[in-house]
Amino acid sequence: MSNDSWSQMGEMGSSLLQGELQGLWLIPLLALPNAIYIWLWIMPGAWINTTKRATPIFGGSWPSDKTSQGDKACQYLAVLAHTIKMIQAACVVAWFRLYSPDSLTVSGVLAQPAWRIVLGVAGLAFGQCLNVAIYAAIGRNGVYYGSRLGAPLGPWVTGFPFNIPVVGRHPQYTGALLSLWGGVLLTSDDSATAAGFPTIAVLWTIIYIITGIVENTEGHGIVSDHPLRPDGPAAKKAARREKAA
């Protein structure tokens, strides 16, 4: 291979890398809610104190009992999470407008191969189905770490979507990732790929996986801490007390 060919390949690689690096500003914004979730998971008391200080600012009164405090903390977290999600969505749209404006158009999506359109739509549909299902199954407090914050919880749920193998451990995160990769299939044309959108999707996936691993720590997970779990820490503690009595 001639020196000119090597030079051209080097320039192409440098151009691609530069494009990807330029687009990676999106990652910190995408990682923000997961960073908050991990912090909250490890230090739930810190979030309780944060919401306690914030409540008077918004004209509310801080409840005196622990259960109501946990419920208030879940309420604040839900508002924060939805606000961040709207900001994230706006930033993703802005990213495409900057680097690949045609990717989000109907004509751009329909220009994708048929197999990508089918798989992309299926991923988005099933992903959103899981997201809706987990809210319906365990409610706001179940989704937003009520087990860690001491909020009132509904019954222990073993049905859909928790009964799906593998997926059932973290239906919401699985739904988010299915939606993400469905979107990648529908929008990653040449310009979006050159700007690094698949790379961003991989990094975003890793962030979700790390969050899921943290939440799977026995004794600290949303599933493990549920007071009504038949084989959970609360049930085992009650059994030990009964045995000692």
Task: Give the location of each predicted region.
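Membrane-anchoring alpha-helices and their flanking helix-loop junctions
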Residues: 1-167, 174-245
